[in-house]
């Protein structure tokens, strides 16, 4: 399961995810309670993402410090990260460092929250998409017309 999707969906769950999976694994029907509204997940990445280039990773990203201007929100999920001498740093080679999630009653509110949370993150050479959720107005109309949403 793509970790961006699972981190984003987990943010919308009221039911603890551990309990949900325990019930599922035990053959019980899990009681899934979720928040109303929308969730958006945005990947914070560094070079070489989206490419596989060990030399670029070694030169620009390996062991780069991950700093938060203020204590991070609960909805920041780590990916290729490790602790080195008490400091969170970039690890792995995928270039995917964090998944930041925003929630809101509307798509615009979820967008505002996720991008506000991203402003709290400082990683050398980091980048991320700034258009997540922008097409929701058109996409939701299509999904309604196709009968997928009611």
Where are these regions (language model features)?
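ATP-dependent carboxylate activation and anion-phosphoryl transfer catalytic cores
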Residues: 1-150
């Amino acid at each position: 399961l793509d970790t961006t999707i699972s981190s984003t969906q987990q943010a919308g769950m009221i039911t603890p995810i551990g309990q949900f999976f325990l019930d599922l694994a035990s053959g019980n029907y899990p009681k899934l309670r979720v928040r109303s509204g929308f969730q958006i997940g945005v990947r914070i990445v560094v070079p070489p993402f989206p490419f596989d280039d060990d030399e670029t990773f070694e030169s620009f990203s390996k062991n780069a410090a991950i700093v938060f201007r203020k204590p991070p929100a609960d909805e920041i999920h780590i990916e290729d990260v490790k602790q080195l001498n008490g400091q969170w740093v970039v690890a792995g080679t995928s270039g995917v460092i964090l998944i930041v999630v925003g929630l809101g009653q509307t798509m615009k509110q979820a967008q505002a929250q996720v991008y506000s949370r991203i402003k709290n993150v400082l990683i050398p050479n980091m980048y991320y998409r700034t258009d997540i959720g922008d097409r929701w107005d058109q996409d939701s109309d299509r999904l309604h017309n196709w009968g997928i949403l009611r």
